[in-house]
From Swiss-Prot:
Coiled coil: none annotated. GO terms for molecular function: metal ion binding. This is Iron-sulfur cluster repair protein YtfE. It comes from the Bacteria. Belongs to the RIC family. YtfE subfamily. Homodimer. GO terms for cellular component: cytoplasm. InterPro entries: FeS-repair_YftE, Hemerythrin-like, RIC_family. Pfam families: Hemerythrin, ScdA_N.
Length: 220
């Protein structure tokens, strides 16, 4: 099956573990989810046929849950428990670890300088963002007023773009989240946690941008 003309966001939602494949190739399926596979591959100078073959293998597996057809209220509850609550746990712990690593290894050239600052910025931005969703946007959607939420949704999508840009800065600061050979246990654990955060946040944004928001605006 030809996947090249389909949007990345749609593929990430319809094929099991496609999101992990896109992450491996550094293809943005959340904020850039509307671009086709062919366009995303061309931008990264990747062979689209190789990626299509990998997607075809993944597509043979059953999908755990197809959120594209789930009720909007169920999607919202899932987002809060699976992503919002998780980010609220992840970021404070990562900030503590980054503070320690930057302090203890300040003399090493490979230390991720500025990481604490960028994680703190992401924490502050996401905390404000998630609160606005939970207090304003999500109740509107649950009350069937999603079609009137064009303003709040455009603000949320803009904030998603800003979070995505911060993730790119964090990846650059951490050598694409790759610990150096001399990294201590805390350093390695922190990078594992950052990888998990990036995976979670990209899935979170994709579910909102590519499923929840379009369906809410369509008047569901």
């Amino acid at each position: 099956m030809a996947y090249r003309d389909q949007p990345l966001g749609e593929l990430a939602l319809s094929i099991p573990r496609a999101s992990a494949l896109f992450r491996k190739y550094d293809m943005d399926y959340c904020c850039g989810g509307k671009q086709t596979l062919a366009r995303a591959a061309a931008r990264k100078e990747l062979d689209v046929e190789v990626i299509e073959a990998e997607l075809a293998k993944l597509a043979e597996q059953p999908i755990e849950k197809d959120w594209r057809s789930a009720p909007l209220a169920e999607i919202i509850d899932h987002i809060i428990v699976r992503y919002h609550d998780r980010h609220r746990e992840q970021l404070p712990e990562l900030i503590l670890q980054a503070t320690k690593v930057e302090r203890v290894h300040a003399d090493k050239p490979s230390v991720p300088k500025g990481l604490t600052k960028y994680l703190t910025m992401l924490h502050e931005e996401l905390s404000s963002h998630m609160m606005k969703e939970e207090q304003i946007l999500f109740p509107m959607i649950k009350q069937g007023m999603g079609s009137q939420a064009m303003g709040p949704i455009s603000v949320m999508e803009s904030e998603h773009d800003e979070a995505g840009e911060l993730l790119e800065v964090i990846k650059h600061t951490t050598n694409n989240v790759t610990p150096p050979p001399e990294a201590c246990t805390t350093w390695k654990a922190m990078y594992n946690g950052i990888n998990e955060l990036i995976d979670d946040l990209m899935e979170h944004i994709s579910l909102e941008n590519n499923v929840l928001f379009p369906r809410a605006l369509a008047g569901e």
